Amino acid sequence: MSTVITILNGPNLNFLGKREPEVYGTETLEYIEKSCQDYAKKLEFMVQCHQTNCEGQLVEWIQEAIGMSAGLIINPAAYGHTSIAIFDALKMFSGPIVEVHLSNIHRREAFRHHSYVSASADAVIVGCGHEGYLFALEYIAKQLRYGYKKRSNQTLLT
């Protein structure tokens, strides 16, 4: 069986391609998921993709990924700026974690500049559009192949 990488997408990402294409691009979530599946296959991994508009469901999927997935990619969308529950759940995951945002959150409204998720992620990719997911897959694949070591859960949240 192939090694699994879980990809989680948060609220409103089911409307990609329709919602603010000047910010998020014209690619649909289905296109992004298919691109990730195809690229993961080339990297000899398998991906499981999920999307929800509900914070609690994201937490449950993170918990399910513990012990089942080798790596995790999360685009928490707006929950990145507000969810301590997602931050806490991610801290329990022992594999590499990459936070992805399609847009550059640091060039947008001030309330989007901070992400709780970033404090529990090994890497953060912003502003690269749908290709950010592919970069995240590449990063996780390299980490897993070359001896990933979990970083300290100590954070600098203030």
Curated annotation (Swiss-Prot):
Keywords: Amino-acid biosynthesis, Aromatic amino acid biosynthesis, Lyase. HAMAP family: AroQ. This is 3-dehydroquinate dehydratase. Catalyzes a trans-dehydration via an enolate intermediate. Pathway: Metabolic intermediate biosynthesis; chorismate biosynthesis; chorismate from D-erythrose 4-phosphate and phosphoenolpyruvate: step 3/7. One of its GO terms (biological process) is amino acid biosynthetic process. Its EC number is 4.2.1.10. PROSITE patterns: DEHYDROQUINASE_II. Gene3D superfamilies: Dehydroquinase, class II. The keyword Amino-acid biosynthesis applies. Belongs to the type-II 3-dehydroquinase family. Pfam families: DHquinase_II (PF01220). One of its GO terms (molecular function) is 3-dehydroquinate dehydratase activity. The keyword Disulfide bond does not apply. The active site is at Y24, H101. It is an enzyme of class 4 (lyase). Homododecamer. It catalyses: 3-dehydroquinate = 3-dehydroshikimate + H2O. The record marks R19 as: Transition state stabilizer. Substrate binds at N75, H81, D88, L102, S103, R112.
